[in-house]
Amino acid sequence: MARTPSSDRPERGRGGERGDRPNRGRGGAEQTPREREESEFVDKLVHINRVAKVVKGGRRFAFAALVVVGDAKGRVGCGSGKAREVPEAIRKATEQAKRNMIKIALREGRTLHHDAYGHFGAGRVILRAAPAGTGIIAGGPMRAVFETMGVQDVVAKCLGTSNPHNMIKATFDALINLASPRHVAAKRGKKVGEIIGRRDGAAAAAAAGV
């Protein structure tokens, strides 16, 4: 039986025809909707420590992890997990953070709409909106929240505690109190332009020292 001439065979590029297939995941399989959703999130490990439980036979040691997860577009959540191994504790904390995510409206996609205050336990936090180019001026645990949320310019300060759990929860308490001009206008029955005009006027007066 005669062989087919090489000139009649279909040409194959480097790596065959696989490069033309979109959404290829690990192992050459297409990414599932869950995998694409998880790839959109940014997670940061804020704190991990070893804990012990006293039982009849002695002490049982485990690890507790605190994780912050966000999509860099205004959504952010925090969670804690405990397990005998560090990776499992981080996985549990990450899953809990994804379930506890909240949506925060950002001004110009980079900062907060207005100043906010929050507290949890002995911790109190102050969040201030900042002009472009300021950057994230905040302590470690709070910085992780803003970075995963997508905030680029903010000034934050924590008072009364150095416990990362209290700092994170106080920060979320402040974020929940934020409201966009559209939400405030709808609540007061006014136009968005009136709310923005008053906000800008108050900011200019504060800058002038009036």
From Swiss-Prot:
Keyword annotations: Ribonucleoprotein, Ribosomal protein, RNA-binding, rRNA-binding
GO CC terms, sorted: small ribosomal subunit
Pfam families xref list: Ribosomal_S5, Ribosomal_S5_C
Biased composition (Basic and acidic residues): 1-23
GO molecular-function term, one example from the UniProt record: structural constituent of ribosome
Keyword field contains Ribosomal protein: yes
Gene Ontology biological process terms, A to Z: translation
Residue intervals of the S5 DRBM domain: 41-104
Subunit structure: Part of the 30S ribosomal subunit. Contacts proteins S4 and S8.
HAMAP family: Ribosomal_uS5_B
Recorded domain comment: The N-terminal domain interacts with the head of the 30S subunit; the C-terminal domain interacts with the body and contacts protein S4. The interaction surface between S4 and S5 is involved in control of translational fidelity.
Function: With S4 and S12 plays an important role in translational accuracy.
Family: Belongs to the universal ribosomal protein uS5 family.
Protein name, entry field: Small ribosomal subunit protein uS5
Biological classification of the source: Bacteria, Pseudomonadati, Pseudomonadota, Alphaproteobacteria, Rhodospirillales
